[in-house]
């Protein structure tokens, strides 16, 4: 879908893949930033790449959509949007479409390259068995409290992938249901206070670790 088509679909309330349009995306030698801020008077991109200077990367706004192409940022660097509201006050906002977030208590997004990981279910579909005639045993699990190291630190996505897979297989479970894994502020919660719908929580590693 081209830019114009996505813009028209967004305005009709029919853009089902907003994450491809908004947020931060690698574009040539720089990054394209785009955010929906209809009440803003002014918006700019700030981050580690420009010293958090609100004057360094101003965004152009049209019909509530603000965007800018910025040269120089590198994957992994932190960023936010500096937004001046109708009241004239400057507020720093996290990108709601960020694919990777700063580890709590920080709230910035991290620039993330699109992965070359070949998402698909072809292998599963080729090898799947007829399961509906047998029992279904679902293991619902919260990754942060399922198992930890002796010092109380979390296992990483990669460590959880190995240990949890072995555990559910040995226990005879046929399916796994993960409690929320998107970014959230409190370690004490189960993850339902989501602050980033497109970012797997950084508590357990990077987006690449999550894909592992």
Regions found by a protein language model. Name each.
Residues 1-32, 60-140, 145-152, 159:
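The feature marks proteins involved in alpha-glucan
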Residues 36-43:
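Short proline/glycine-enriched turn/loop motifs at strand-loop junctions of beta-rich domains
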Residues 43-45, 79:
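Short beta-strand elements bearing conserved aromatic residues within extracellular beta-rich modules
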Residues 46, 142-144, 179, 200:
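Conserved residues at the C-terminal ends of beta-strands
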Residues 126-128, 161-172:
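Short amphipathic alpha-helices and their capping/turn segments at secondary-structure boundaries
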Residues 155, 166-211:
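Aromatic-lined carbohydrate-binding/catalytic grooves of carbohydrate-active enzymes
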């Amino acid at each position: 879908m081209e830019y114009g088509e996505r813009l028209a679909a967004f305005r009709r309330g029919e853009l089902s893949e907003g994450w491809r349009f908004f947020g931060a995306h690698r574009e040539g030698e720089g990054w394209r930033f785009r955010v929906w801020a209809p009440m803003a008077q002014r918006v700019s991109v700030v981050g580690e790449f420009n010293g958090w200077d609100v004057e360094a990367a101003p965004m152009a706004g049209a019909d509530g959509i603000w965007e800018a192409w910025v040269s120089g940022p590198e994957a992994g660097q932190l960023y936010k949007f500096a937004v001046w509201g109708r009241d004239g006050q400057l507020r720093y906002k996290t990108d709601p479409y960020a694919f990777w977030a700063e580890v709590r208590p920080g709230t910035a997004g991290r620039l993330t390259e699109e992965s070359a990981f070949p998402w698909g279910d072809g292998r599963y579909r080729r090898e799947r068995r007829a399961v509906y005639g047998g029992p279904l045993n679902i293991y619902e699990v919260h990754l942060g409290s399922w198992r930890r190291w002796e010092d109380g630190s979390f296992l990483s996505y990669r460590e959880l992938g190995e240990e949890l897979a072995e555990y559910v297989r040995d226990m005879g479970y046929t399916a796994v249901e993960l409690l929320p894994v998107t970014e959230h502020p409190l370690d004490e919660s189960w993850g339902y206070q989501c602050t980033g719908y497109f970012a797997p929580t950084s508590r357990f590693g990077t987006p690449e670790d999550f894909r592992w």
